[in-house]
Amino acid sequence: MEIKRETSTSVSDPSPSKSKNKNSKGKALKRGLNIEGYQIEGISIAGHETCVIIPTLNLAFDIGKCPQRAVSQQFLFISHGHMDHIGGLPMYVATRGLYRMTPPTIFVPKAVKESVEKIFEAHRAMDQSELKHTLIALDVGEEICLRKDLKVRAFKTYHVIPSQGYIVYSIKHKLKQEYIGLPAEEIKKLKSSCVEITNTVTTPEIAFTGDTMSDFILDNDNIDALRARILIVESTYVEETVTAENAREYGHTHLSEIVKHADRLENKAILLIHFSARYQLDVIQEAISALPPPLAGRVFALTEGF
């Protein structure tokens, strides 16, 4: 895998169940949600565990307590080093080894790589097993190609310890306008003559923030996260018994801040995660149902566990 560098980065309050939102863009499934054509599963309860799984892309964001469904994913992206986001890492690797699956590839912020290596050293000593995996430090602005049609880039987030989010891009090669309509045989000849007949189109599909203050929305380097098809963003607090200022003290985001910056969010769908455990499911649902335009109808909640 090639890492590219670009010039262009918990103190968690401990709370997600299946969303009742049902429309053509976000349907509640028996397991997880289907949003904008992507199946999204997992659990995210602030201070307890966060793991968001995209099965069709064979990847997961953060590993929490290592829910069983996450074990099937080949690629794992860790946003930061707080226990509710990284605690299940050794179990994830060990379980894949138990099932004789391909050793996983794990991406972590550069600042925590050495600590993660020490975690595995300790578990190898205790468990007397290899815990095979590939560990890659991915810094803000760096990107990794997972396959020919898929790449991931790290972007800066704003938490109380080093943190970062990730953007998943689709890569497509589209025939240039001047060659559209040509016979297949002529297209074949052009290709064999090394003529560049396609344009590469890179599209941000999914952005995952992990834990962060709303400052990431105002960071001009994060524009792709704000125009990704789906933005998976923390919203630890959703009502006014805890203020936005309180949320910032813990390095988190309040739903009111997402409303405040709604005009900057070009995403087709927004999936809220990482709700405080203080909330009952109906409180979360009521907060989302009360959202004003332009958020109404395109915001969903990962509420497994509430």
Residue ranges, per PLM feature:
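Acidic/glycine-enriched edge-of-secondary-structure segments
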Residues: 45, 49-53, 74-82, 203-208, ...
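Binuclear metal-ion centers of metallo-dependent hydrolases, dominated by the metallo-beta-lactamase
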Residues: 130, 134-142, 216-306
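Active-site metal-binding motif and surrounding structural segment of the metallo-beta-lactamase
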Residues: 62-108, 137
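Active-site-proximal loop/helix segment associated with metal-binding centers of metalloenzymes
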Residues: 45, 147-226, 230-235, 240
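Active-site neighborhood of phospho(di)ester-bond hydrolases with catalytic His/Asp-centered motifs
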Residues: 61-64, 73-84, 109, 207-212, ...
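Metal-dependent catalytic neighborhoods of phosphoester/phosphodiester hydrolases
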Residues: 88-95, 121, 280-289
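Active-site neighborhood of divalent metal-dependent phosphoester bond hydrolases
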Residues: 102-104, 112-137, 278
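Conserved beta-strand hairpin/beta-sheet module of binuclear metal-dependent hydrolase folds
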Residues: 2-74, 165-168, 174, 198-209, ...
